Amino acid sequence: MSQQENKKMINVGVIGAGGRMGRMLIEAIQDNPQTALNAAIERQGSSLVGADAGEVAAIGRLEVQIVDDLKAVINDIDVLIDFSLPAATEQNMQVCAKHNVAMVIGTTGFNEQQEQVLAKASEQVAIVYAGNYSTGVNLSLKLLGMAAKAFGTDADVEIIEAHHKHKIDAPSGTAYMMAEAVAEARGQNLKEVVVYGREGQTGAREAGTIGIHAIRGGEIIGDHTVMFIADGEVVEITHRARARMTFAAGAVRAATWIVQQPVGQYNMQDVLGLNDYI
């Protein structure tokens, strides 16, 4: 590769490089002609520290050594991709904001304080924050908004999500995104109308509420179905993920996009240009 071509490469760092998603991200970065892996980070105490990131991802040696300190490599990257845990991502946002490094965040389960850290960081650097990076899911969000506007509160809305038995949070970030899309289209505050599962003597279903139900089992990558249940008809919008590479490739696509954007917080629909449509 010529020196001129090399200047065009986007240097990417990956948090959780040895995890399932991290390994997929490394492969996706190498598959994308615009990006190069330049930093791979694992938690302190990980047995993978010191290993070659490419060998860990089973794609061949990349000469990128896994480290346990983001600060040690922060100046080597243009953008950081973080699919980890809320507490870790909170710290990483502060480091990136201090060093003017863009971020792509796929971590879910933030509390209010961590959301405030995200908002503050996005005042200093450009950040893509999404619960799901697949094109199909983000297209589904647009369709959900259309359906919610058409039905209004005349239809009862129930969301059912299913994931593998290893997932540690529920409901999924994608389920929240779908519920938020419906609530926003209906002019509702999601926190005021959401119902998480049902048990016991719940009484009659309250009109306008949005139900969310979580299933965990096996190795399901991610299934989401939103039901609009009206008198005399039911409309279902379903997305099923069949390969994690879908999410990884989408996150890398977001990384190539965010480095060209001004400071601010964006979502995957911004990346895909879907916000240009009704």
From Swiss-Prot:
Residues where NADP(+) binds: R43
PROSITE patterns xrefs: DAPB
Active site: H163, K167
Biological processes, Gene Ontology terms: diaminopimelate biosynthetic process; lysine biosynthetic process via diaminopimelate
Keywords assigned by UniProt, alphabetized: Amino-acid biosynthesis, Cytoplasm, Diaminopimelate biosynthesis, Lysine biosynthesis, NAD, NADP, Oxidoreductase
Molecular function terms, GO-annotated: 4-hydroxy-tetrahydrodipicolinate reductase; NAD binding; NADP binding; oxidoreductase activity, acting on CH or CH2 groups, NAD or NADP as acceptor
Major subcellular site: cytoplasm
Pfam families: DapB_C (PF05173), DapB_N (PF01113)
One GO CC annotation: cytosol
Record protein name field: 4-hydroxy-tetrahydrodipicolinate reductase
Lineage: Bacteria, Pseudomonadati, Pseudomonadota, Gammaproteobacteria, Moraxellales
Gene name tied to this protein: dapB
